[in-house]
């Protein structure tokens, strides 16, 4: 039992360390330290889809402020790039840990505990466009494939990912599968191609509904790109044979500029956010144009080691029935 546990931990560490090294080298980012707490009222907290309640924390020696455990570091990263004067093409990555207690379900792929490679880069002049988004996606996908090949060489786990990732807009997907739900569409397209980047998540589609929810103040999901499609963000999805479904590894995108921010908060009715310090700084031109995202660490490990449950690669909290159903939950 001890031997199996140690081997399990070594595998997890190998995947994380290998991916980190490739990501830093290929994406050309520097690893930095990030926060676990965000001060309430400064607008730095990531509101995700806008419905999640963060964990509130009171600090004894700072009685005049309330803090929250971060959901992600989307806004903090952009603030940090500005604060320390990162130049065009430069960026950072954080080994981020967060709590999301309002997850809809605790299942094979969802946990209260979230760990990500949370990265952000300053966009080079003239590249705030779909082509640069795709170029960055291809770089990250290359890192995923290189890590998968390293796992294959070390642990004899067969590599399954295609050489290229397929790009498709959410508008194309709803037209292709009009009678399917968003999740069913993801399953259909990802099973066909093996690896997909789904572009444009957050805006309302021709069927009157968004593909999925996104907060209005980090990713740009409204800018028109090509053929009348909208959005400069998306998800990296791969086909997971263990689960028999599409599997999200990363959510990422080009971040809002001043116009996209104002447009999106009006669409979602969140104009009050424009009064936060972070949002004022963006509107006043104090932040660089950036691209960024989060890559799930436990999800990456789970996929590359062909595990059935995310609890096999991270230590979290689970209902007893989950622990009873899976022998290798940590």
Swiss-Prot record:
It catalyses: L-aspartate + NH4(+) + ATP = L-asparagine + AMP + diphosphate + H(+). GO terms for molecular function: aspartate-ammonia ligase activity; ATP binding; catalytic activity, acting on a protein; transferase activity. It is found in: Cytoplasm. It comes from the Bacteria. The keyword Transferase does not apply. Pathway: Amino-acid biosynthesis; L-asparagine biosynthesis; L-asparagine from L-aspartate (ammonia route): step 1/1. Pfam families: AsnA (PF03590). GO terms for biological process: L-asparagine biosynthetic process. Belongs to the class-II aminoacyl-tRNA synthetase family. AsnA subfamily. This is Aspartate--ammonia ligase. It comes from Streptococcus pyogenes serotype M1. The lineage of its organism: Bacteria, Bacillati, Bacillota, Bacilli, Lactobacillales. The gene is asnA.
């Amino acid at each position: 039992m001890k031997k199996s546990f140690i081997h399990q931990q070594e595998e997890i560490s190998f995947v994380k360390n290998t991916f980190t090294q490739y990501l830093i080298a290929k994406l050309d980012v520097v690893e930095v330290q990030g926060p676990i707490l965000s001060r309430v009222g400064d607008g730095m907290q990531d509101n995700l889809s806008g419905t999640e309640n963060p964990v509130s924390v009171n600090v004894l020696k700072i009685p005049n402020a309330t803090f929250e455990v971060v959901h992600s570091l989307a806004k903090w990263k952009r603030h940090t790039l500005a604060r320390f004067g990162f130049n065009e093409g430069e960026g950072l990555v954080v080994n981020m840990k967060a709590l999301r207690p309002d997850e809809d379900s605790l299942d094979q792929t969802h946990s209260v505990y979230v760990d990500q490679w949370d990265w952000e880069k300053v966009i080079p002049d003239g590249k705030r466009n779909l082509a640069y988004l795709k170029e960055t996606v291809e770089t990250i996908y290359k890192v995923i494939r290189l890590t998968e090949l390293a796992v294959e060489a070390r642990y004899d786990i067969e590599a399954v990912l295609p050489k290229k990732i397929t790009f498709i807009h959410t508008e194309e997907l709803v037209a292709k599968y009009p009678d399917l739900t968003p999740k069913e569409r993801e399953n259909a397209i990802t099973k066909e191609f093996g690896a997909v980047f789904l572009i444009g998540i957050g805006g309302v589609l021709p069927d009157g509904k968004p593909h999925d929810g996104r907060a209005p103040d980090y990713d740009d999901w409204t800018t028109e790109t090509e053929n009348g499609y909208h959005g400069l963000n998306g998800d990296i999805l791969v086909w997971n044979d263990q689960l028999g479904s599409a599997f999200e590894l990363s959510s990422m995108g080009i971040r809002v500029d001043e116009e996209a921010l104002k447009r999106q908060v009006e669409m979602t009715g969140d104009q009050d956010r424009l009064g936060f310090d972070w949002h004022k700084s963006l509107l006043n031109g104090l932040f660089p144009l950036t691209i960024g995202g989060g890559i799930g660490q436990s999800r990456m490990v789970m996929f590359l080691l062909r595990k059935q449950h995310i609890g096999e690669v991270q230590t979290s909290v689970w209902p007893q029935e989950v622990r009873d159903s899976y022998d290798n939950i940590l």
